[in-house]
Protein backbone atom coordinates (compact mmCIF):
# COMPACT_ATOMS: atom_id res chain seq x y z
CA UNK A 1 0.00 0.00 0.00
CA UNK A 2 1.02 3.65 -0.22
CA UNK A 3 1.21 3.76 3.56
CA UNK A 4 3.48 0.71 3.69
CA UNK A 5 5.79 2.22 1.07
CA UNK A 6 5.96 5.40 3.15
CA UNK A 7 6.79 3.43 6.28
CA UNK A 8 9.57 1.54 4.49
CA UNK A 9 10.92 4.86 3.25
CA UNK A 10 11.09 6.05 6.85
CA UNK A 11 12.80 2.82 7.92
CA UNK A 12 15.50 3.47 5.31
CA UNK A 13 16.33 6.68 7.19
CA UNK A 14 15.74 5.79 10.85
CA UNK A 15 15.40 2.82 13.17
CA UNK A 16 11.79 1.62 13.58
CA UNK A 17 11.83 2.55 17.27
CA UNK A 18 12.38 6.19 16.25
CA UNK A 19 9.41 6.31 13.86
CA UNK A 20 6.08 7.77 14.92
CA UNK A 21 2.85 7.29 12.98
CA UNK A 22 0.01 9.77 13.41
CA UNK A 23 -3.42 8.58 12.31
CA UNK A 24 -7.08 8.99 13.14
CA UNK A 25 -8.13 6.61 15.89
CA UNK A 26 -10.58 4.87 13.53
CA UNK A 27 -7.61 3.74 11.40
CA UNK A 28 -5.36 2.53 14.24
CA UNK A 29 -5.91 -1.22 13.74
CA UNK A 30 -5.50 -0.98 9.97
CA UNK A 31 -2.22 0.89 10.50
CA UNK A 32 -0.98 -1.66 13.03
CA UNK A 33 -1.85 -4.57 10.71
CA UNK A 34 -0.13 -2.97 7.73
CA UNK A 35 3.07 -2.34 9.67
CA UNK A 36 3.01 -5.87 11.10
CA UNK A 37 2.81 -7.22 7.52
CA UNK A 38 6.18 -5.56 6.89
CA UNK A 39 7.78 -7.39 9.80
CA UNK A 40 8.01 -4.26 11.95
CA UNK A 41 5.29 -4.54 14.63
CA UNK A 42 4.80 -1.04 15.99
CA UNK A 43 4.90 -0.38 19.73
CA UNK A 44 1.73 1.19 21.09
CA UNK A 45 3.64 4.31 22.15
CA UNK A 46 4.83 4.89 18.56
CA UNK A 47 1.27 5.17 17.22
CA UNK A 48 -0.37 8.53 17.94
CA UNK A 49 -4.14 8.47 17.51
CA UNK A 50 -6.07 11.63 16.71
CA UNK A 51 -9.59 11.58 18.20
CA UNK A 52 -10.61 14.03 15.45
CA UNK A 53 -8.85 15.31 12.36
CA UNK A 54 -7.35 18.78 12.79
CA UNK A 55 -5.22 19.03 9.63
CA UNK A 56 -1.43 18.79 9.52
CA UNK A 57 -0.17 21.38 12.02
CA UNK A 58 -1.74 19.82 15.15
CA UNK A 59 -0.74 16.36 13.88
CA UNK A 60 2.90 17.39 13.47
CA UNK A 61 2.83 19.26 16.79
CA UNK A 62 1.52 16.13 18.49
CA UNK A 63 4.39 14.06 17.08
CA UNK A 64 6.96 16.75 17.91
CA UNK A 65 5.78 16.79 21.52
CA UNK A 66 6.42 13.06 21.89
CA UNK A 67 9.76 13.22 20.09
CA UNK A 68 10.96 16.09 22.29
CA UNK A 69 10.33 13.97 25.40
CA UNK A 70 12.75 11.33 24.12
CA UNK A 71 15.32 13.57 22.45
CA UNK A 72 15.16 17.39 22.69
CA UNK A 73 17.85 17.65 20.00
CA UNK A 74 16.13 15.35 17.50
CA UNK A 75 15.51 16.10 13.86
CA UNK A 76 11.97 15.45 12.64
CA UNK A 77 11.24 14.29 9.09
CA UNK A 78 7.58 14.48 8.03
CA UNK A 79 6.25 12.16 5.31
CA UNK A 80 2.61 12.17 4.14
CA UNK A 81 1.34 8.64 3.54
CA UNK A 82 -0.09 9.13 0.04
CA UNK A 83 3.01 10.07 -1.94
CA UNK A 84 5.07 8.18 -4.47
CA UNK A 85 8.77 9.07 -4.14
CA UNK A 86 11.74 7.60 -5.98
CA UNK A 87 14.48 5.99 -3.86
CA UNK A 88 17.04 8.46 -5.21
CA UNK A 89 15.41 11.10 -2.99
CA UNK A 90 16.90 9.57 0.16
CA UNK A 91 20.36 11.03 -0.49
CA UNK A 92 18.89 14.43 -1.32
CA UNK A 93 16.91 14.39 1.93
CA UNK A 94 20.07 13.57 3.88
CA UNK A 95 21.81 16.57 2.29
CA UNK A 96 19.37 18.88 4.12
CA UNK A 97 20.37 17.78 7.64
CA UNK A 98 22.70 20.73 8.29
CA UNK A 99 20.12 23.27 7.09
CA UNK A 100 17.49 21.68 9.31
CA UNK A 101 19.45 22.42 12.48
CA UNK A 102 18.32 26.06 12.44
CA UNK A 103 15.58 26.16 9.79
CA UNK A 104 12.28 24.65 8.78
CA UNK A 105 13.14 22.75 5.59
CA UNK A 106 10.47 22.06 2.98
CA UNK A 107 11.34 19.84 0.04
CA UNK A 108 10.46 21.29 -3.35
CA UNK A 109 9.96 19.27 -6.51
CA UNK A 110 11.28 20.47 -9.85
CA UNK A 111 8.10 20.67 -11.95
CA UNK A 112 7.62 18.28 -14.85
CA UNK A 113 5.24 20.87 -16.28
CA UNK A 114 2.48 23.28 -15.25
CA UNK A 115 0.22 21.57 -12.73
CA UNK A 116 -2.82 23.18 -11.14
CA UNK A 117 -3.15 20.63 -8.34
CA UNK A 118 -0.06 21.64 -6.35
CA UNK A 119 1.05 24.67 -4.39
CA UNK A 120 4.28 26.34 -5.52
CA UNK A 121 7.39 27.65 -3.78
CA UNK A 122 9.34 30.69 -5.00
CA UNK A 123 13.02 30.05 -4.19
CA UNK A 124 15.13 33.01 -3.12
CA UNK A 125 18.78 33.32 -2.13
CA UNK A 126 20.82 30.12 -2.35
CA UNK A 127 21.75 28.54 0.98
CA UNK A 128 23.65 25.25 1.14
CA UNK A 129 21.88 22.65 -1.01
CA UNK A 130 18.72 24.76 -1.01
CA UNK A 131 17.26 28.24 -1.11
CA UNK A 132 15.71 30.65 1.34
CA UNK A 133 11.96 30.63 0.59
CA UNK A 134 10.79 33.89 -0.92
CA UNK A 135 7.09 33.07 -1.10
CA UNK A 136 4.51 30.29 -1.11
CA UNK A 137 1.82 30.28 -3.78
CA UNK A 138 -1.54 28.56 -3.61
CA UNK A 139 -2.73 26.17 -6.33
CA UNK A 140 -2.82 28.28 -9.52
CA UNK A 141 -4.78 28.24 -12.75
CA UNK A 142 -2.98 26.74 -15.75
CA UNK A 143 -1.61 29.99 -17.20
CA UNK A 144 -0.23 31.04 -13.82
CA UNK A 145 1.24 27.56 -13.28
CA UNK A 146 3.04 27.83 -16.63
CA UNK A 147 4.45 31.21 -15.56
CA UNK A 148 5.67 29.71 -12.26
CA UNK A 149 7.44 26.91 -14.13
CA UNK A 150 9.17 29.41 -16.43
CA UNK A 151 10.34 31.42 -13.41
CA UNK A 152 11.89 28.42 -11.67
CA UNK A 153 9.29 27.83 -8.96
CA UNK A 154 9.08 24.43 -7.28
CA UNK A 155 6.13 22.26 -6.42
CA UNK A 156 5.44 22.17 -2.69
CA UNK A 157 5.77 18.48 -1.78
CA UNK A 158 4.37 18.59 1.75
CA UNK A 159 7.50 16.86 3.12
CA UNK A 160 9.47 18.65 5.83
CA UNK A 161 12.62 18.36 7.94
CA UNK A 162 13.45 20.40 11.04
CA UNK A 163 14.85 20.16 14.53
CA UNK A 164 12.22 19.67 17.20
CA UNK A 165 13.71 22.72 18.95
CA UNK A 166 13.25 25.06 15.96
CA UNK A 167 9.75 23.74 15.32
CA UNK A 168 8.78 24.35 18.95
CA UNK A 169 10.24 27.87 18.88
CA UNK A 170 8.38 28.80 15.70
CA UNK A 171 5.15 27.20 16.89
CA UNK A 172 5.29 29.23 20.11
CA UNK A 173 6.03 32.37 18.13
CA UNK A 174 3.34 32.06 15.45
CA UNK A 175 0.69 29.74 16.95
CA UNK A 176 0.96 30.25 20.72
CA UNK A 177 -2.45 28.73 21.44
CA UNK A 178 -1.52 25.45 19.75
CA UNK A 179 1.89 25.45 21.42
CA UNK A 180 0.29 26.03 24.83
CA UNK A 181 -2.21 23.21 24.25
CA UNK A 182 0.62 20.74 23.78
CA UNK A 183 2.33 21.86 26.98
CA UNK A 184 -0.61 20.43 28.94
CA UNK A 185 -0.22 16.92 30.35
CA UNK A 186 -3.26 15.83 28.29
CA UNK A 187 -3.86 18.18 25.33
CA UNK A 188 -7.51 18.94 24.53
CA UNK A 189 -7.17 17.85 20.91
CA UNK A 190 -10.78 18.47 19.77
CA UNK A 191 -10.48 22.11 20.85
CA UNK A 192 -7.54 22.77 18.51
CA UNK A 193 -8.09 24.71 15.28
CA UNK A 194 -7.94 22.85 11.98
CA UNK A 195 -4.79 24.31 10.44
CA UNK A 196 -2.26 23.13 7.88
CA UNK A 197 1.45 23.34 8.68
CA UNK A 198 1.94 25.34 5.48
CA UNK A 199 -0.62 28.03 6.27
CA UNK A 200 -0.17 28.05 10.04
CA UNK A 201 3.62 28.00 10.23
CA UNK A 202 5.69 27.89 7.06
CA UNK A 203 4.02 30.83 5.34
CA UNK A 204 4.54 33.10 8.35
CA UNK A 205 7.98 32.00 9.58
CA UNK A 206 11.18 33.71 8.43
CA UNK A 207 13.21 30.54 9.05
CA UNK A 208 12.08 28.51 6.04
CA UNK A 209 14.30 27.07 3.32
CA UNK A 210 13.49 24.76 0.44
CA UNK A 211 15.70 21.95 -0.85
CA UNK A 212 14.89 20.82 -4.40
CA UNK A 213 14.43 17.11 -5.04
CA UNK A 214 15.16 15.69 -8.47
CA UNK A 215 13.55 12.33 -7.67
CA UNK A 216 10.32 11.17 -9.25
CA UNK A 217 7.44 12.31 -7.03
CA UNK A 218 3.66 12.29 -7.20
CA UNK A 219 1.02 13.21 -4.67
CA UNK A 220 -1.45 10.34 -5.03
CA UNK A 221 -4.22 11.90 -2.97
CA UNK A 222 -6.78 11.53 -5.76
CA UNK A 223 -7.83 8.76 -8.16
CA UNK A 224 -6.91 11.08 -11.04
CA UNK A 225 -3.33 11.31 -9.77
CA UNK A 226 -3.16 7.52 -9.37
CA UNK A 227 -4.44 7.04 -12.92
CA UNK A 228 -1.69 9.28 -14.29
CA UNK A 229 1.11 7.04 -13.02
CA UNK A 230 -0.54 3.60 -13.19
CA UNK A 231 0.00 0.99 -15.90
CA UNK A 232 -2.97 0.91 -18.28
CA UNK A 233 -4.41 -1.80 -20.52
CA UNK A 234 -5.16 -1.40 -24.22
CA UNK A 235 -8.44 0.34 -23.44
CA UNK A 236 -6.86 2.81 -21.05
CA UNK A 237 -8.20 1.06 -17.95
CA UNK A 238 -6.26 0.63 -14.71
CA UNK A 239 -6.69 -2.39 -12.46
CA UNK A 240 -5.07 -3.12 -9.11
CA UNK A 241 -5.73 -6.60 -7.79
CA UNK A 242 -5.08 -8.38 -4.51
CA UNK A 243 -5.98 -11.97 -5.31
CA UNK A 244 -7.01 -14.04 -8.33
CA UNK A 245 -8.63 -12.41 -11.33
Question: What are the residue ranges of the model-derived segments?
Answer:
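A conserved hydrophobic position in a structured secondary element of the catalytic/binding core
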Residues: 23, 79, 140, 162, ...
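Conserved core of the sugar-phosphate nucleotidyltransferase
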Residues: 86-180, 186-189, 209
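Cofactor-binding loop segments of dinucleotide-utilizing enzymes, especially the Rossmann-like FAD-
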Residues: 24, 81, 109, 213
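A short acidic, often aromatic-flanked loop/helix-cap motif at beta-alpha or helix-coil junctions
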Residues: 53-58, 113-115, 142-143, 217-218
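Structural motif
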Residues: 19-20, 46, 75-77, 103-106, ...
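Conserved N-terminal catalytic core of the sugar/cofactor nucleotidyltransferase
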Residues: 1-78, 84-90, 94
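Left-handed beta-helix
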Residues: 162-245
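Residue-level signal for inorganic ion chemistry
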Residues: 3, 63, 82, 121, ...
